[in-house]
Design a protein with these regions (language model features):
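Long, low-complexity intrinsically disordered regions
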Residues: 1-286
Length: 286
């Protein structure tokens, strides 16, 4: 059985994750270039999910600091200041964690979402079929009718202001973000902390996104995203793809098989330190 070359794998990840000091990001413009280069990255590292993150590319391969004055937290300002600039797509997407997506790649994600063209109707179908909670429906309809709102006002409009509604409201926002129905588009001085995200309907903030996505088939979208993922991490097991993207195992397997058939990946590989079948870029195989 062919074996992964760990030295080459580690070298690739050091490059794509920007862990070396000389490769670190030092400006918002470099951060945008980094996201465009990788296609999609996490804001902060996510335990159990291997993917480049803005934090690591700025602060190095270390845990996110608790101290607010840590130099690595410059990333927070970069994120907030970019939300209304349309330089990338940002929201709680992959595994419902904070994710940056390049504008070129966003249509591939959108093509896999449950959005089919009518922003005033899709959510109703999803609700009637049990794929959208009542809280998510209320939040979405508040934004649909009133326009961009900060989270404090949004809770009031959605009638989810009670303390017992905290988790319900937060889950609704996460679900709507993960399905590309809403996204944060700015911040506002609101609430006790004088800080709150502003949200809007995705298709209203990026009106060209649905049309671009309409030309992309689901299988094509999955292949593109899986190829970018492998380009960032070099080698994966089937479960890694399934967990990151939330795809059914059979679709993940079919997607990887197509990349193998096209010569972009090798399959049936062994890892010197981890059992199971691995898929990897061809240049990482001995």
């Amino acid at each position: 059985m062919p074996t992964l070359n760990l030295e080459r794998l580690q070298a690739l990840r050091a490059r794509t994750f920007r862990v070396l000091p000389k490769a670190r990001l030092t400006s918002p413009a470099q951060a945008v270039d980094f996201v465009n280069e990788r296609g999609f990255v996490f804001f902060w590292p996510v335990k159990g999910l291997l993917l480049p993150s803005l934090w690591t590319a700025v602060a190095g391969d270390r845990p996110v600091a608790d101290e607010h004055d840590d130099p690595g937290h410059v990333t927070w300002g970069w994120k907030d200041n970019s939300l209304d600039k349309r330089v990338w797509y940002y929201g709680k997407i992959l595994h419902r964690k904070a994710t940056f997506i390049s504008l070129e790649i966003a249509p591939y994600f959108y093509a896999l979402s449950e959005n089919y063209g009518d922003i005033a109707e899709d959510h109703l179908v999803a609700y009637e079929e049990g794929r959208l909670t009542l809280a998510a429906k209320l939040v979405y309809e508040a934004l649909l009718s009133k326009g961009k709102m900060n989270t404090i006002d949004l809770r009031k409009e959605a009638h989810l202001t009670s303390k017992s509604s905290d988790s319900e409201f937060n889950r609704a926002l996460e679900h709507l973000q993960a399905d590309f129905k809403v996204l944060p588009v700015g911040t506002a001085e609101a609430g006790a902390w004088k800080y709150a995200y502003q949200f809007d309907i995705t298709a209203r903030h990026f009106p060209e996104l649905p049309e671009k996505a309409r030309r992309i088939g689901e299988a094509e979208a999955r292949r593109k995203l899986a190829e970018l993922y492998l380009g960032s991490v070099g080698a994966v097991q089937l479960r890694d793809v399934t967990r990151l993207f939330g795809w059914p195992p059979e679709l993940s397997k079919r997607t990887l098989a197509h990349l193998v058939e096209s010569g972009k990946l090798c399959a049936g590989l062994s890892h010197p330190q981890t059992a199971g079948e691995w898929f990897a870029l061809t240049e990482l195989v001995d």
